[in-house]
């Protein structure tokens, strides 16, 4: 895999990871932090897209009312929204989503599709899933069974 930065320069292999945001149900969040604390902490390592503030991220994730609660008190669906948010709002050109709708209810799945449409237009988006509703907007698909 090779990639170029925004100026067209080749990104060295050992720096490619810096261009990637990832969300997966098995990745942990710091549950002792409130949502705002966690997003602020994340932003120090992985800045969010320009013109995006923490309050608006909470609102767009449907979690504004819970922004001052510790994440340990979130449902599994709320935690998945946080994981998706930290990846999708990141100022990274590559987004990897593994089973992105795990633990999401119908409202959360619709939110997921809205966020994809809004936040990934100029990004390489890779979704790993066997669930049709998670990949319904994908233009290209790679079926791993074709390579066994």
Predicted regions and their residues:
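Q-loop/switch helix immediately C-terminal to the Walker
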Residues: 26, 31-47
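Conserved ABC ATPase "signature" region
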Residues: 51-66
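Conserved ABC ATPase signature
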Residues: 70-79
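Hydrophobic anchor residue at the start of the ABC signature
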Residues: 84
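Catalytic Walker B motif of ABC-type/P-loop ATPase nucleotide-binding domains
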Residues: 95-99
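Helix N-cap at the start of a conserved alpha-helix in ABC-type nucleotide-binding domains
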Residues: 106-107
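Conserved catalytic loops of ABC-family nucleotide-binding domains
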Residues: 115-135
């Amino acid at each position: 895999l090779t990639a170029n930065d925004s100026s067209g320069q080749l990104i060295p292999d050992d720096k490619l990871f810096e261009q990637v945001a990832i969300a997966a149900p098995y990745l942990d969040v710091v549950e002792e932090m409130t949502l705002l604390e966690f997003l602020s902490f994340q932003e120090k390592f992985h800045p969010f897209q320009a013109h995006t503030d923490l309050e608006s991220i909470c609102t767009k994730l449907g979690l504004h009312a819970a922004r001052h609660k510790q994440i340990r008190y979130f449902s599994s669906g709320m935690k998945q929204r946080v994981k998706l948010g930290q990846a999708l709002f990141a100022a990274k050109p590559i987004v990897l989503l593994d089973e992105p709708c795990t633990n999401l209810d119908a409202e959360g799945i619709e939110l997921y599709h809205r966020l994809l449409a809004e936040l990934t237009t100029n990004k390489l988006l890779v979704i790993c899933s066997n669930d049709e509703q998670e990949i319904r907007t994908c233009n290209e698909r790679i079926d791993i069974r074709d390579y066994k």
